[in-house]
Design a protein with these regions (language model features):
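Interfacial helix-loop-helix junctions of multi-pass membrane proteins
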Residues: 54-71, 114-141, 183-196
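Transmembrane helix exit motif
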Residues: 92, 147, 151, 177-181
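Hydrophobic alpha-helical segments of integral membrane proteins
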Residues: 2-9, 152, 187-198
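Cytosolic-side transmembrane helix boundary signature
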Residues: 136-163
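Internal/C-terminal transmembrane anchor helices
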Residues: 159-179
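Long hydrophobic alpha-helical segments typical of transmembrane helices together
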Residues: 175-212
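Internal alpha-helical transmembrane segments of multi-pass membrane proteins
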Residues: 96-106, 131, 155-166
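Hydrophobic alpha-helical bundle signature of multipass membrane enzymes
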Residues: 1-71, 77-99, 103-107, 111, ...
Length: 212
């Protein structure tokens, strides 16, 4: 199995443009604008927490050596962004169909996020604690969004036009085909050294070298 490809489903190259496309499509309809803002806020908070945890580690060395923890896994979190994105993405795409199909779409989204998280373990990009923390963070954000939608007085507000559906499907497919990974880790490392007290980004190796 191509675990690198599966991991790419949680890469910022795919998730951030796809998230932007989803926000734009929702904003085009007046009835779904509140939905767009609710989702973008929760997705943004999830991403901000992931970035903050990584900056805290790379800039100040704040990690947990016993758990091999260096911050939330962005792939399993942005998949806290896959677990925050894919369940909602698939739920919105299936909004016109039966309740059973919508539930299946959400479950598929969470399963995909979990598989992305597992792929990060297979390719040795994250520890178990980081993947679990990321999945829990992302799942919490998407679950809160879905709970909020149960209270919406207008179920039509979640319906996306067929043109919008086509656009939303094409964006991630094109990005997945590109295979280009976002340099988010190196960018966060540069920011961490700029704002933190360290001369270079703190690493997992540094964490395990610490004497207690």
């Amino acid at each position: 199995m191509n675990w690198q490809l599966i991991s790419f489903f949680g890469d910022s190259t795919v998730l951030l443009p796809s998230a932007a496309a989803l926000f734009i499509v929702l904003m085009l309809r007046k009835t779904s604008r509140l939905l767009a803002w609710q989702w973008s806020l929760l997705f943004g908070i999830t991403g901000a927490i992931v970035c903050a945890s990584k900056l805290a580690f790379m800039g100040w060395g704040l990690g947990i050596r016993e758990l091999d923890y260096t911050g939330f896994s962005g792939h399993s979190a942005l998949s806290a962004l896959s677990a925050a994105f894919w369940p909602i993405f698939l739920w919105l795409l299936s909004a016109r169909f039966s309740v059973g199909l919508r539930k299946a779409a959400v479950i598929t989204g969470y399963v995909l996020a979990a598989v992305v998280g597992y792929s990060r373990l297979v390719i040795h990009a994250h520890s178990v604690s980081e993947v679990i923390a990321g999945l829990l963070l992302g799942a919490a954000g998407s679950a809160l969004f879905l709970v909020l939608q149960k209270r919406t007085p207008d179920p039509e507000s979640v319906h996306i036009s067929w043109g919008g559906v086509a656009c939303l499907v094409m964006v991630p497919l094109i990005l997945l085909h590109s295979g280009s990974k976002a340099p988010t880790q190196s960018l966060l490392g540069q920011i961490a050294t700029a704002v933190g007290p360290l001369d270079k980004p703190f690493t997992r190796t540094d964490l395990h070298k610490q004497a207690w």
